[in-house]
């Protein structure tokens, strides 16, 4: 199962692709898309869409996992991230790929065992779970890999529950 994880944003979109075979995770690729910061939002979103389409066509994922926006105090920022998230959902839908969205707390819990884990703890767990020498850079790509790992973990848990094998 090849999973594309996406960490959406209007300034930087991180993406990471993992291959999951049984309990073994393998890094396939990762990077980020950085639209011109001075461009208007519609042009940035078009840049992100085009880039994600290229990623999907290059890596041929089976499923896509996207981090959902976190709305704390900065609603304007959450709305902007929501626009980038919608573009990611559209790119996946236009390629008939199943998409699952995960909250930041769910990703932290699945990857590091705590919904309150720090960004550094998540990135270190990504490094360990993918058996890497260094934490992937840029940070947005490491975050996207965490989204993909979260999706794999959730799928594995769902499979165990559906089989009734809780021993």
Swiss-Prot record:
UniProt keyword terms in alphabetical order: Cytoplasm, DNA damage, DNA recombination, DNA repair, DNA-binding, Endonuclease, Hydrolase, Magnesium, Metal-binding, Nuclease
Required co-factors? Mg(2+)
Q: Which GO terms describe its biological process?
A: DNA recombination; DNA repair
* Subcellular localization(s) per the UniProt record: Cytoplasm
Residues where Mg(2+) 1 binds: 7, 140
UniProt function note: The RuvA-RuvB-RuvC complex processes Holliday junction (HJ) DNA during genetic recombination and DNA repair. Endonuclease that resolves HJ intermediates. Cleaves cruciform DNA by making single-stranded nicks across the HJ at symmetrical positions within the homologous arms, yielding a 5'-phosphate and a 3'-hydroxyl group; requires a central core of homology in the junction. The consensus cleavage sequence is 5'-(A/T)TT(C/G)-3'. Cleavage occurs on the 3'-side of the TT dinucleotide at the point of strand exchange.
Q: What is the protein name for this chain? A: Crossover junction endodeoxyribonuclease RuvC
Gene source species: Dehalococcoides mccartyi (strain CBDB1)
């Amino acid at each position: 199962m090849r999973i594309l994880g996406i960490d959406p944003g209007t300034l930087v979109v991180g993406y990471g692709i993992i291959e999951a075979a049984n309990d073994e995770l393998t890094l396939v690729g990762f990077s980020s898309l950085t639209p011109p910061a001075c461009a208007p939002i519609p042009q940035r979103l078009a840049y992100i869409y085009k880039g994600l389409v290229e990623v999907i066509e290059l890596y041929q994922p089976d499923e896509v996992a996207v981090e959902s926006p976190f709305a704390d105090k900065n609603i304007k920022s959450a709305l902007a991230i929501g626009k980038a998230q919608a573009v990611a959902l559209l790119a996946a839908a236009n390629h008939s790929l199943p998409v699952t969205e995960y909250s930041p707390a769910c990703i932290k819990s699945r990857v590091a065992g705590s919904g309150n884990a720090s960004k550094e703890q998540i990135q270190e767990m990504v490094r360990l779970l993918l058996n890497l020498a260094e934490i992937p850079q840029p940070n947005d790509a490491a975050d996207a890999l965490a989204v993909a790992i979260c999706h794999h973990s959730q799928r594995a848990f769902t499979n165990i529950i559906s089989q009734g094998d809780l021993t």
